[in-house]
UniProtKB/Swiss-Prot annotation:
One of its GO terms (molecular function) is undecaprenyldiphospho-muramoylpentapeptide beta-N-acetylglucosaminyltransferase activity. Its EC number is 2.4.1.227. This is UDP-N-acetylglucosamine--N-acetylmuramyl-(pentapeptide) pyrophosphoryl-undecaprenol N-acetylglucosamine transferase. Pathway: Cell wall biogenesis; peptidoglycan biosynthesis. The lineage of its organism: Bacteria, Bacillati, Bacillota, Bacilli, Bacillales.
Length: 356
């Protein structure tokens, strides 16, 4: 029986693709295990949503693009992570490693290479991340969500496969969503998602605009961990720090979304044909990958986008109103999108690429 080791973590985006693939792997008769960090969000997500999967925690550092004394310390963490991962891989003897990226994945990919275990990497963003750039040197193949990403990668190693969406995404129950929120079925619902880490600026502007927003929408506000404001209580407004199992039910009642521009999230909104106003992480907080993702979706006519540096209460309301006027056009553009690979076909390709 073919055994696949999965790795990736640090943010929800580096875990959600694996969460969508592992159930398909199990249903097709593959064995699966997960290697991640000791305290990262991937451990919480995998152990809560896939308790049947063995989770192996390893030491991991952080990949920084700036000079810091912490970089020296993290060299030793990465080296220990390689040793930790080698120990796991020698014990489990997987046939291949599937890496979703994030800083925890690098020592695992290096360890796999040292044991002659073939690695397939997945890159969700339009431009490759630092972890995947490093890991690619030790990998057999890299799969991309955006076709344009192939321009940044060696032709002999890169293949475009499109987005990988979790199976339960379309199974959200609107009735459950309305019961969960207590919302009125006859009024539009706006979902605000600031990413797994949240956005203090976006949260502040939403709360500042709440009275105006509530005239047109009921608002579900995913604030990010530790950013919920218990003092803000209004009819038609509900806050969560983070939603796991109930997210599909909330998406089932969502008419419009304001969101960061992580690739996995925006492809889920695209699949569900939910018009989106994207506020990507700025260059002061990231390498600009979300800006590229957002601009690509805007160019395709799937979304509107606002730079966080330009985000004000007035601009937010203005862009939302314009998007509502273009709602039909945006949804029609979304209907032209087609998924490139089924998960079953993707696993067939993965096995062929890794083991041949």
């Amino acid at each position: 029986m073919t055994k696949i080791a999965f790795t990736g973590g640090g943010t929800v985006g580096h875990v959600s693709v694996n969460l969508s693939l592992i159930p398909t792997a199990l249903s097709q008769g593959y064995e699966a295990l997960y290697i991640g960090s000791k305290n990262g969000i991937e451990r919480e997500m995998i152990e809560s949503q896939l308790p049947e999967i063995k989770y192996y925690p390893i030491s991991s550092g952080k990949l920084r693009r700036y000079i810091s004394l912490e970089n020296a310390k993290d060299v030793f963490k990465v080296l220990k992570g390689i040793l930790d991962a080698r120990k796991v891989l020698k014990k489990e003897k997987p046939d291949l490693l599937f890496s979703k990226g994030g800083f925890v994945s690098v020592p695992v990919v290096i360890a796999a290479k040292s044991l002659n275990i073939p690695t397939i990497i997945h890159e969700s963003d339009l431009t490759p991340g630092l972890a995947n750039k490093i890991a690619l040197k030790f990998a057999k193949k890299i799969y991309t969500t955006f076709e344009e990403t192939l321009n940044y990668l060696p032709k002999e190693k890169a293949d475009f496969i499109g987005a990988t969406i979790r199976e339960d995404l379309k199974n959200g129950n609107a009735h459950n969503g309305y019961q969960l929120t207590g919302f009125n079925e006859n009024k539009k619902v706006l979902l605000v998602m600031g990413g797994s880490l949240g956005s203090k600026k976006l949260n502040s502007i939403i709360r500042e605009n709440l009275d105006a927003l509530l005239q047109q929408y009921q608002v579900i506000h995913l604030t990010g961990k530790g950013l919920k404001d218990a003092q803000v209580k209004k009819s038609g407004y509900i806050q969560y720090e983070f939603v796991k199992e109930d997210l599909t039910d909330l998406l089932a009642i969502t008419d419009t979304v304001i969101s960061r521009a992580g690739s996995n999230a925006i492809y889920e909104f695209l699949t569900l044909r939910i018009p989106m106003l994207l506020v990507p992480l700025g260059l002061d907080q990231s390498r600009g990958d979300q800006i590229d993702n957002a601009n690509h979706f805007a160019d395709k006519g799937y979304a509107k986008t606002i730079d966080e540096e330009q985000l004000t209460a007035q601009i937010l309301l203005q862009e939302l109103n314009e998007m509502e006027q273009e709602r039909t056009r945006i949804i029609n553009n979304m209907k032209s999108y087609e998924q490139s690979y089924t998960k079953e076909a993707l696993f067939d390709k993965m096995i062929k690429d890794a083991l041949n």
